[in-house]
Amino acid sequence: MQNSRSTKLFQQALQSIPGGVNSPVRAFRSVGSDPLFIKKAAGPRIYDEDGNAFIDYVGSWGPMILGHCHPQVVSAIKAAVDNGASFGAPTELEITLAEMVIDAVPSIEMVRMVSSGTEATMSAIRLARGYTGRDNILKFSGCYHGHSDSLLVKAGSGAATFGVPDSPGVPADLAKHTLTATYNDLDSVRALVAANKGSIACIIVEPVAGNMGTVPPKEGFLEGLRSICSEEGIVLIFDEVMSGFRVAYGGVQELYGVTPDMTTLGKIIGGGLPVGAFGGKKEIMSLLSPAGGVYQAGTLSGNPLAMTAGIETLKLLKQPGFYQKLEEKSAFVAEGIAKAAKDAGFPIYSTRVGSMFCAFFSKDPVYDWDSAAKCDTKAFAAYFKAMLNEGIYLAPSQFETAFVGISHSTEDLEQTIAAAAKCFKAL
């Protein structure tokens, strides 16, 4: 594969952008190569600066559930920009998207729009602290909730990609308020809650973990968290930035039937533009400024372009049969890759929830961060490079989720499975 222009651009980027990228995982460091620079995308394909085409399973890290450049979304954005990109004032579009989100997500009675998933989780935690009058928060090893200081503790994903669980620059006095439990282990949660009784404001969790690969919740795990939080007066926050509108229209909480007190969203609800949101019970959300004393603000929050893209995306997701078709496509490709590995005698552990899936390079089950961390990352790196040479674009890290979109055709999926079979045999 010819990638000389991408290599040249990366060298140029290193002179002006720290690490040459604006988000660490894009650097391809964990797979030992230089990143591809993307020029354009359409449907299920992306095209790099050297003219190579790839079937895309990154989907801009999740938002592109419709595929790239969906004509209805693009047309709506073009029409919206003619009216102005941002006003710093309320618009009817904000109300429309808010009502669509409230209608879709079981836990959300009121919602505030922001500009990123990090803003959403950061603000949700501040609100939970304000609501409860407590300082401590509880999260899970390997779950990533953005790069705010309180949440960069055993954070999985980008940090895990480089083998660094924490970040310099996070004050110890702040980090001490972040308690860390083991994902899928209710006993670890109960022990921390008992040891810190009356001091925990919230438990925040990816209800389907997507930042240590795709790790589904064990039976009873989410229900157990709901019970503990209800008993102890702790706010339960589902971080559905990744899973919201992805595994079902109403997210994981619809799929599993467990309702948190608050939910954070992002990615899909912006239709590919920068957006985040957090919402929940009215009694909690009503404490948010200017209605209440918990402060949060943002210059571009609810900007008309992101709201327009989100509205058009959710309209398309609500079409009859959308998620059934997506489920069939996702099952086909995930099961096909798993079978290809088995036929080649190559040990992987395959997981999937809806259109999120992962092939863990492990012979043992993966159910938390410790089990995920045992994966053979060198073998994954070889697989990643081999798949890239076959025209398949996967996330450049073992600890990320692959995403299927509605634009992936049967031919695309079959080509992907055939490529995987070839690569597993070569490995």
From Swiss-Prot:
Keyword Cytoplasm on entry: yes
Disulfide partners: none
Top-rank taxon, per record: Bacteria
GO molecular function, one term: glutamate-1-semialdehyde 2,1-aminomutase activity
Keywords: Cytoplasm, Isomerase, Porphyrin biosynthesis, Pyridoxal phosphate
UniProt-annotated location(s): Cytoplasm
GO cellular component terms given for this protein: cytoplasm
EC number: 5.4.3.8
PROSITE patterns found in the cross-reference section: AA_TRANSFER_CLASS_3
CDD domains per record: OAT_like
List of residues that carry N6-(pyridoxal phosphate)lysine: 267
Keyword Isomerase in record: yes
SUPFAM superfamilies per record: PLP-dependent transferases
GO biological process, one term: protoporphyrinogen IX biosynthetic process
Cofactor: pyridoxal 5'-phosphate
Top EC category: isomerase
PANTHER family: GLUTAMATE-1-SEMIALDEHYDE 2,1-AMINOMUTASE, GLUTAMATE-1-SEMIALDEHYDE 2,1-AMINOMUTASE 1, CHLOROPLASTIC-RELATED
Similarity annotation: Belongs to the class-III pyridoxal-phosphate-dependent aminotransferase family. HemL subfamily.
Subunit-structure text: Homodimer.
The protein, known as: Glutamate-1-semialdehyde 2,1-aminomutase
Taxonomic source organism: Citrifermentans bemidjiense (strain ATCC BAA-1014 / DSM 16622 / JCM 12645 / Bem)
